[in-house]
Amino acid sequence: MILIIYAHPYPHHSHANKRMLEQARTLEGVEIRSLYQLYPDFNIDIAAEQEALSRADLIVWQHPMQWYSIPPLLKLWIDKVFSHGWAYGHGGTALHGKHLLWAVTTGGGESHFEIGAHPGFDVLSQPLQATAIYCGLNWLPPFAMHCTFICDDETLEGQARHYKQRLLEWQEAHHG
């Protein structure tokens, strides 16, 4: 099962992430948990989230990039749900062997994330990748949709279909 942990602080204003979710919903075996809809008060139901994660083979963290980072509720979700003794530490093997895909949208172009004036995209992913590896997850190459503020509808739809294809290819490779 693919579990998408969706963290968009303003989902009604989304153009790119909305299309990505629409494409993902067309696949069998996909569950979407929209954190800002489930937890507008930031009071996370840790047991419910851990139960959802236990059913997943692929976990997707999908969100818009905010100031070169993840939205605050996703950070809190990771801090609370990936708890000691469950996700890491003595007895913390609940996530071992599962896969993690970071699916992120950005307003800037791909060149904006090249080493130079701004941090490279690989540098930005390091804290997430380190968290995944520390918890025994298999880190997959990220999916990034760039220039989402200026893309036309056709481009956004094409990128959303590409996202669906990434998920489908993972399903086929792991579940035949």
Curated annotation (Swiss-Prot):
Reaction catalyzed: a quinone + NADH + H(+) = a quinol + NAD(+); a quinone + NADPH + H(+) = a quinol + NADP(+)
Disulfide bond positions: none
Any one Gene Ontology BP term: intracellular pH elevation
Major localisation: membrane
GO CC terms: plasma membrane; potassium:proton antiporter complex
Class in the EC hierarchy, top level: oxidoreductase
Ranges annotated as spanning the membrane: none
Effect of G107S: Does not bind FMN. Lacks oxidoreductase activity, but is still able to activate potassium efflux
EC number(s) on file: 1.6.5.2
Ligand binding (FMN): H8, S14, H15, A16, N17, M65, Q66, W67, Y68, T105, T106, G107, G108
Function: Regulatory subunit of a potassium efflux system that confers protection against electrophiles. Required for full activity of KefC. Shows redox enzymatic activity, but this enzymatic activity is not required for activation of KefC. Can use a wide range of substrates, including electrophilic quinones, and its function could be to reduce the redox toxicity of electrophilic quinones in parallel with acting as triggers for the KefC efflux system.
Protein's name according to its UniProt entry: Glutathione-regulated potassium-efflux system ancillary protein KefF
Biological source species: Escherichia coli (strain K12)
